[in-house]
Amino acid sequence: MPLYKTELHCHTRDGSCCASESTEATIEKYIAAGYTSLVITNHMQSYRIGSTEPFPFSIPTYEEYVDYCYDAIDLARRVADGRLYVLDGFEMRIPYCTNDYLVYGLDRECVKAFNIIKAELDTASKYIRENGGVIVQAHPMRFGMTLVRPEYIDGYEVHNSHNKPFMNTMIREWIGHIGADDKIFTAGTDHHNHDDIPSAGILTEAPIKTTEELISVLKSRSFKIFPEE
């Protein structure tokens, strides 16, 4: 039985200032790499709202920031034109901390309705879950990250292709020590630039065509991550 590949961590130049590859090039790259689905997870960071930097390094209001993020997802869908399923997501950073969290399952209007990147983690997590979403701590062992209480998140990104290999090993060891083996474990390329090779994600027996299907797959753990470590 064929397995279908989904990327869970991908940035595009049209939605993340730290990414340099165009949406068009990114979509073609993932199609060529044999992926069926792609979650666009551009950054949403609280410190970028209303700063003195020029756009898009600074965005005047939260609502405009949400539109900027989701417009990039819509652009990716248009570019893919049915050749690749493009799904909603974002990578958020909340105040007073350099941790990053991958959020799946919330549409544009849901994110606009509550300033999620100004909230404390427990409040943000509660909102995400109450609205059917999933929150995963991204690259937890990267330098500058802080490990958080497991009850505030649904899962951990246990493989990130931008990490040093020992960082991916360490998170698995830490999860075992704290008894958090019931959490969702994910993998992602953390794609940003032209030289980033799509190399990670999840494998499923059926293609993931919608964000709702993605949430169902994640919550049911009906997938395998790749690469295996």
Regions found by a protein language model. Name each.
Residues 1-8, 12, 23-28, 95-111, ...:
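Charged catalytic cores and adjacent phosphate/nucleic-acid-binding surfaces used
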Residues 17-18, 115-116, 206:
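Residues that cap or flank secondary-structure elements
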Residues 19-20, 117-118, 167-168:
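A conditional alpha-helix N-cap/helix-loop micro-motif detector
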Residues 37-40, 87-88, 136, 157, ...:
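Structural recognition of the beta-strand scaffold that forms the well-ordered cores
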Residues 57-61, 109-114:
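Glycine-rich tight-turn/loop motif centered on a GG-T
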Residues 80-82, 131, 181:
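Helix C-cap/helix->beta junction micro-motif
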Residues 98, 114-116, 120-123:
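C-terminal active-site-proximal or functional interface alpha/beta core segments in diverse enzymes
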